[in-house]
């Protein structure tokens, strides 16, 4: 499986879920790298994020299709998108993609999609779900979390405490840099960089079901995409406060028993 995704947390989550299922995974961070990877080796399926730097998923798909031999094998390409917008699926299909998977990605949806398109796992029984003893205690459930939806996070990660912890740690490591990029690009009037940073942050907080942080990030992304930066300072401040709340929730989760060895 070729995974083309620029968000570090989403990369890690999808790769680990696929590897648990028995799939070999190659990860690239933009469309140009995806095109090069397909030219160099054969893949069963491509998972293609539609919004990536340098070359986006639509452009990469068009280039891959242009390189295919007429009448020859058609490489299945599955779009990954955070856009829950009517007509988005049709745009993906028109671009030459074969199917569509909405982010944040759920384990069952991911497995069903790639195996429907021909990427058979090395061992279909590899992922049996969590060991029953992991449900003996649920200290994470006892925590009163202000922003993070633990049930959604467990659903995304297949109820795997290790994977939940890894995704949380990635967010804690990258979210401060993303917020700083958002502040700096707003101060400099750099709408393009602002939009990209807000988009990346939006994709990360979606994994945790942090709706207020997600909406704030989406507002910043949409405004900057249309170069409407006036009045964004207050929205960015709200976003920073919501991200801090998510970070606090995740730090508490990492300290809870079910996320420790």
Language-model-detected regions and their locations in the chain:
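C-terminal compact regulatory domains
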Residues: 1-143, 247-251, 261
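Two-component system phosphorelay core
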Residues: 99, 106-261
């Amino acid at each position: 499986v070729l995974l083309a995704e620029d968000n570090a947390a989403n990369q890690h989550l999808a790769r680990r879920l696929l590897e648990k299922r028995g799939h070999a995974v190659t990860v690239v961070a933009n469309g140009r790298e995806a095109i090069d990877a397909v030219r160099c080796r054969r893949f069963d399926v491509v998972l293609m994020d539609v919004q990536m730097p340098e070359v986006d998923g639509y452009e990469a798909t068009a280039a891959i299709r242009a390189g295919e031999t007429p009448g020859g094998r058609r490489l299945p390409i599955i779009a990954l998108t955070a856009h829950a917008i009517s007509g988005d699926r049709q745009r993906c299909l028109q671009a030459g993609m074969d199917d569509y998977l909405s982010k944040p990605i759920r384990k069952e949806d991911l497995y069903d999609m790639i195996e429907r398109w021909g990427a058979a796992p090395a061992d279909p029984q590899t992922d049996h779900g969590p060991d029953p003893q992991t449900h003996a205690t649920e200290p994470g459930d006892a925590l009163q979390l202000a922003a993070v939806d633990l049930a959604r996070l467990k659903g995304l990660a297949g109820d795997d405490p290790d994977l939940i912890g890894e995704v949380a740690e990635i967010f804690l490591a990258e979210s401060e840099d993303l917020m700083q990029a958002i502040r700096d690009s707003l101060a400099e009037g750099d709408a393009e960089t602002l939009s990209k940073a807000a988009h990346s942050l939006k994709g990360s907080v979606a994994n945790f079901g942090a709706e207020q942080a997600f909406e704030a990030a989406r507002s910043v992304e949409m405004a900057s995409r249309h170069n409407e930066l006036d009045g964004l300072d207050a929205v960015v401040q709200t976003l920073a406060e919501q991200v801090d709340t998510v970070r606090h929730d995740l730090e508490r989760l990492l300290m809870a028993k079910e996320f420790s060895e």
